Design a protein with these regions (language model features):
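N-terminal beta1-alpha1-beta2 submodule of the flavodoxin-like/Rossmannoid cofactor-binding fold
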Residues: 1-97, 101, 165
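Cofactor-binding loop segments of dinucleotide-utilizing enzymes, especially the Rossmann-like FAD-
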Residues: 8, 35, 127-128, 160
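Short, well-ordered beta-strand core segments
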Residues: 77, 123-124
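Short, acidic/small-residue loops that bind anionic groups at enzyme active sites
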Residues: 99-114
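Short, conserved loop/helix-junction motifs that constitute active-site signature segments
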Residues: 114-120, 150-151
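Glycine-rich phosphate/pyrophosphate-binding loop and the adjoining helix
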Residues: 134-168
Length: 168
């Protein structure tokens, strides 16, 4: 079983990363994508045109699709991200833009509805925050929608919050 660990932690001393490492401990088949080291660019019009042309020709060999293929092939997805501004760092949204590829992680049915193609049975969203976050964690809610669209049936939320509140 392959676990894809999408690491959206900004530094190695991250409390979120510590929680993720504890979750992943003992799992021998972890592929890690360190987003802050990838320098992924947000899509501009030129990239969109290139991607559309490749998708229309089902030309999946371009390196532009490597992250999407990796995501689609994983048995489990673990998203590790700090709680920033009610959700997550922008680098994680940029990653999802690169992963969301019609024909790899989902496709459209004849009725025009998206249908997931991912192998994963579960997506685990791990986060930490200095204050409260469970009342409004739009990051997890976003990934629940992504999991549904990509055909991943289970989502789980693991959070350590109030880490900077004295007395908690």
């Amino acid at each position: 079983m392959t676990t894809l660990f999408v690491n959206a932690c900004a530094h190695d001393e991250s409390r979120t990363l510590s929680l993720c490492r504890a979750y992943l401990e003992g799992n021998p088949a972890v592929e890690e994508v360190r987003l802050f080291e990838r320098n992924l660019a947000p899509f501009d019009w030129k990239m969109v045109e290139q991607r559309v042309a490749l998708i229309e020709n089902a030309d999946w060999g371009d390196s532009m699709f490597d992250l999407a293929k990796q995501f689609a092939a994983a048995d489990e997805i673990v998203i590790g991200t700090p709680y920033w501004d009610l959700s997550f760092p922008a680098v994680l949204k940029i990653y999802i833009e690169h992963v969301t590829v019609n024909g790899i992680v989902f496709h459209y049915t004849e009725e025009g509805r998206p249908e997931g193609l991912c192998k994963a049975k579960r997506l685990v969203y791990i986060t930490t925050s200095g204050g409260p976050c469970s009342f409004a964690n739009y990051g997890f809610e976003y990934f629940q929608g992504i999991a549904h669209m990509f055909g991943i049936p289970e989502t789980h939320f693991i959070s350590a919050e109030l880490l900077d509140v004295i007395g908690q």
